[in-house]
Structure formats: C-alpha cells, structure tokens
C-alpha cells in the first residue's frame, strides 16, 4: 500500500484512494476478482524502470527479512504494455533489483512472465515474441488472472510455442475452481 501511494504521487497517477490506510483496507479482498481489482489498480502506477525496480526491491527486502535465499517471481507485461510502458522498461527494472539482491544479499532469483487469461491468445503471442528477446532473463512463462471462461486449453498452442522457444511453463490454477 505504501509503495502504491508513493508511486501514484511520483508519477501523477490518480488512484481511487486518498491514503495508505484506504489502500490497506482495499486489500481485505474476499475472492479472486476483488484481489484482481486492487492488483490492477496497483499496476497502473508502475510507469518507469525505477518503479519496477522499487516494487521488486520492496519484495526482495521482505524475502531477506524472511530468510528466503531463492525466489521465482511472476510479472505481467500485458498489464503495462497497453499503457505505453515498454517491455524493456519492465524487465530492466525487475532485473536490476534482482541483480542487486544477488550482489547484496546473495538471494538468487528467476523471472517468470505470465500471460493474462482474460486476454485473447493472439495478444499473448505478441508478448511471447517480446519475451524471446529476453531469454537470458526470463526462465519461463505462466498463466494468471481470472480463470472463469478462460481454461488452460484456450492457450494450448501458445504454450506449445513457448516450450519450442525453450521456456519452462507453469500456470496459476484453482483460485476459482473448475
């Protein structure tokens, strides 16, 4: 909540919350859709490489506090690309924070790019094409967002192509049932 509020101010992005406390109360979600609502509102304040660095670094500090020595993080470029944020901006900000984590805390990491289930497979293929430029930084691809009406079979050919490109695959599943 604190970082979301800070980045909204820094980037002059209006959010529907007047304080950190209001954001914190919005985090009392009861189902996947209410979680996704606050998640996407938070995503909207991420604009610059520095923002992605700051978000990743905050996560790394929590990892350090919890004595985590390896982490595999997911990111959703499709949440940002339509707003004009470049794939390079996203991946460089995340990667620089993860490199700093390795250098300063010896926390190792891997990056997994996720496709958004509620979007069509064609838009996911476009993002996969971008991801191929960063195979040195992205270990795998995944699937997340709303499951209702978006079964994994919808993305069968996408995942086949990702595997052909050398990516490992994973998917969030079960948050909303069959």
Segments (PLM) and residue ranges:
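Active-site metal-binding loops of divalent metal-dependent hydrolases
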Residues: 173
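Metal-cofactor-binding active-site regions of metalloenzymes
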Residues: 1-167, 176-178
